[in-house]
Amino acid sequence: MLSAVLSANPGDFSASLVRLLGLESVESLSETLVEHYEQMSAHPLDINTSSRAELLSTGFFTPFQVASILDYISDNGPILSFFELSGIIGIGEQMADDLRWFFRCDPPRRQSLKSNRAYRPEVKFTGSIRESVRPSGVGTLAKCELAYGERVTALMAIRDDRPAFSVSLSGRRHLEKLVVGGFNARFAQGLLLWNGFSMSGLYDLAGFSRNPTGLSSSVSSASLVGVASTWSWKRSVLGIGLTEKGLAIMNYGFYTARGSYSLTALYENGACGASADMKATLGLFTLWSEGALYYKDGVLGSAAVGGLYCNIAYRKRVGAFVKARSESFSVQNSNVTGLKPGQSAVGLGVDWQVFSAVGEVLFRGQELSARGLEKWNWTAEWGEFQIEGELRHSWKYASGMKNEMRASVSASGAPFYYGGRVQVHKGKDWSGLCYLEAGLRQALCRVLYFDARKWDDRLYAYARDVPGSFSVPAYYGKGLECSLFVRDPKRWAIKAGYTFYFSDKADKWEVKAYVRF
């Protein structure tokens, strides 16, 4: 049964985002990616009035899923609940529950009462102070958001002494969106143009194939700056943009009930590139591919990726992929599927309810390497508590073998939350960490112990952070970290932490604050 309310677990947002994007773990997220989806979560889209281009631009849906949603609304009327959404072909209970963060299901009467001319001002400020082995530093991030109804949004940010802005207009009829200032561009599978959001090289099975978001407003440090717009008519979507550095981009996509087909082109200072992409669902099978060419300084480079899913049943599927990159393929804003120049790879994956596993073998001349991961997730109920657990093993073989085992468990029952993790890594030497965290939904305390004597055996663990900031610190040395996280979900948040080192390394501390007006 689909849960009627969101869990009290304060990490649910990150967990939902990991599942929707098909990532291996929360450590695979990036600050710019989290910032983008936090902004989207603050102003959820109405799934009943969102266009095809708007649904695709979230990056959560395949063209087949979007077609299923639009066909359902056309045949049956508005979707009135997330339980109803879960019954649509290609969605399911888990995905519908995760989408609660980013969408709303407004009934027609409520839609008619809402004014699209309401002025919505919002100002956010994030500040941090750090003291460590490096000279002390003060970091600030101030963000301001002004909106006029649902159509006009202005974003402004100052990171330390670097200002950024972005103004977005949602148009009518054929003009879907116009952006002036900072923007991100994510097309096809990312071979030619995929800026702003970085992900790890190896994904969960769902992440073998990416869902592009097109052009979106952004004030992150990795944004492009210029003018961009998205146009749509019937089943076609056209995205065009021009940056201050002279990068011209264009993407044309054509969508059917079963798939999508697109062409992407770019030009910058004498260099040019083009790619073709397709994704189609036929019965139990989903096929996707993209091929790209890039010409610069008299040299032509190429890259390609393709794969196949077999969707046996809900939460039961297998998949495979191949990908390759030439030595001379060097697009600046590309995310070339985790490959080095001249490298190619093949991979397999399976997702079978609570168990999933992926692995790939990479080739580069005479060099051979491989990597993979296996996960087992489980849930249980004990009284009023919802208990979730995960066992995870990841491995990598290059010049030597590296293994990492991770076991984590959390229990939440409003208003309480408890969690912990044990993580062991075997590379050149042994290393490990463990932590316990407990508290209320608005206040959480964590104590973490780590022992990683060599830098090559360092460990990473997600640390809960204030909105507008995201951190996956590397733990190196031997020490104990204590942190406290307190928040008012709608107004403010404070995080304070202190790390004691049991060696000659200097202790360090950090304080972060977030205020929203």
Where are these regions (language model features)?
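Outer-membrane beta-barrel pore proteins
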Residues: R117-Y119, L146-Y148, M199-G207, Y255
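Compositionally biased linear targeting/interaction segments
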Residues: V5-R173, V179-R186, S326
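Exposed, low-structure sequence patches enriched in small/polar residues
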Residues: C272-G273, G283-L284, W288-F517
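Hydrophobic, small-residue-rich alpha-helical packing segments that form membrane-like cores
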Residues: S221-V225, L238-A257, Y261, Y267
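Outer membrane beta-barrel
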Residues: R162-I240, G319-A324, L433-Y435, Q442-D456
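Beta-stranded membrane pore/translocator domains
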Residues: V133-G139, A147-T153, A157-R159, A164, ...
